[in-house]
Amino acid sequence: MLFFPKPRPPRPGALRAGLAALIMGAVVWPVIGAARPGAVPAPVPAPVPPLAVSLGDGLATRYAAARAEILAAVRTADRHGHHRRAAALRELAAPARRFLAFDGRDGGRAAEVFGDLPTARGIAVLVPGAGVDLDRYGPLRGGATRLRDALGDGSAVVAWLGYATPSSVSLQALTPARADAALPALRAFVRELRAARPAARIWLVCHSYGSVVCGRAAGGLDVAGVVLLGGPGAGVATAAALGPYAEVWAGRAAGDWVALLPHVSVELPFATVGLAADPVSPGFGARILDAGGGGHGDYLAAGSPALASVARIVAGAGDGDG
């Protein structure tokens, strides 16, 4: 009988070194097919008044205007043969859905509201990571819905798809370039929200590559705090860079593959490869929340410890494991 010894698991240092080599290989030999799919045509959206102007009786008008933009994008997508996109957009245009903004171009931009924005004492802005666009919007909406349910009355959640996310497996997901491009839009949105709701506690809840976006954008913003979930990096070196007064929390589930990524930054002539500090490392300085044992996509899953932790934090009750 032949005996095959059980292979020993690779040492963490060797695994990280190998992953670093893969990152470098991704720079030199880009993955075929990793480029973002061709943009689906969509009309240019009409300008909208500032949220502070719309927040009262005008909010329903702003929601209706965004719905009209979505329906216009449906017609354009159908006319150009993009029927999958058209079907996804029809779901977004349901009368019960409420969008502050919509732009169907370049993968799509949207800001959807869950809860009563004018009366909410606490507002969570949910910032997604790689691979999210109008065709793959469902997980973002689901997470926002569950977080709003966990927070209860007196709260609102905004699902903010306000930037061109990188593809899930791509060189773009290994550099801060997409996060830097998103920075002006996220800052402008949060400032508009703050002007409309000066007394509300506003939190950024950022998943995966969204942690890099929030890390780059949060400094100088008037927010109560930032929550980084499953972040492959924080975009900055320490939690202090996210603002002198903001609470900074981070969590990583026990089954999240992001833990295997090396946290290195390599300056090359044409790109910076790496996403800065590990958000859950002691040196970063964030408070650590209970993220449970799920995987990378499970942070806001129904019944998850991370969902309960985020709800407690945003509600101002902290987290038991912090």
Per-segment meaning from a language model:
Residues 1-139, 316-322:
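Flexible, membrane-associating and regulatory peripheral segments of lipid-active enzymes
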Residues 3-6, 185-189:
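Well-ordered alpha-helical segments embedded in enzymatic catalytic cores
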Residues 110-114, 191, 214-216, 236-239:
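Generic recognition of flexible, low-complexity loop/linker segments
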Residues 122-124, 201-203, 225:
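Structural motif
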Residues 126-127, 205, 251:
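Short hydrophobic segments within beta-strands
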Residues 130-133, 138-145, 150-188, 196-200, ...:
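Lipolytic serine-hydrolase domain surface
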Residues 186-188, 192, 208-209:
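Well-ordered beta-sheet/strand-loop patches within structured domains
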Residues 205-215:
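Gly/Ala-rich beta-loop-alpha elbow adjacent to hydrolase catalytic centers
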